């Protein structure tokens, strides 16, 4: 059985306050994008171990046990005593990009296991499991435009459609650590809340729908800011870094052709339509 976990972008990201536990409260909108990995499972009843993980495409560092698709399997196996499986994961969503690739893989793994083994878990139940794997994992269970707050784990659906808009996602060969991203963050409530800003026409978003991490990340990694500026020069109606980076996306009007640009070596580029 196979499924195709998709990426997400952040539409605005406001760091509103620092919490007593050291984490930060934020507001953002998660929006699904048709940039996809491929995830397949095959049962292996005679296998001498619970799982085997086979990875293809973009290289993923770390031990297999630390991969979120494995953690998702072990999470459900602990309760439902699942049959041993082979996991085949083809990575096309870059990691460390702010696109939620690992979280999406985990959420889609939960949904795949639920269907394959007929566990009859509801979406609400799957969201609870997903939330234990990562703050944004639960978003990918319903996989629809969502307003997120708290530490990115409190969700409410929003009536937003960008259907037809073209999207260009660029990720330079740059890694942004969480510590770097938060280094110069000054929590505040923006003039336009995320919820208010997204109600405005997309061509007004440039000045009012802001990702607070850009002020912290761009001075440390100027190439990311340069990509955003170039997307605007090439006609994007809105451009932003996604999450804490390092990918940047541009939204383009439904009509017309996306620009052909040489973004340099070791740069990931995705063109698609929302």
From Swiss-Prot:
EC supergroup of this enzyme: transferase
GO molecular function, a single term: 4-(cytidine 5'-diphospho)-2-C-methyl-D-erythritol kinase activity
Active site, per annotation: 8, 136
Keywords noted in UniProt: ATP-binding, Isoprene biosynthesis, Kinase, Nucleotide-binding, Transferase
Known EC number: 2.7.1.148
Lineage: superkingdom: Bacteria
InterPro entries with a match to the protein in the record: GHMP_kinase_C_dom, GHMP_kinase_C_sf, GHMP_kinase_N_dom, IspE, Ribosomal_Su5_D2-typ_SF, Ribsml_uS5_D2-typ_fold_subgr
Residues binding ATP: 94-104
Key word Transferase present: yes
General function of this protein: Catalyzes the phosphorylation of the position 2 hydroxy group of 4-diphosphocytidyl-2C-methyl-D-erythritol.
Name of the protein described by the UniProt record: 4-diphosphocytidyl-2-C-methyl-D-erythritol kinase
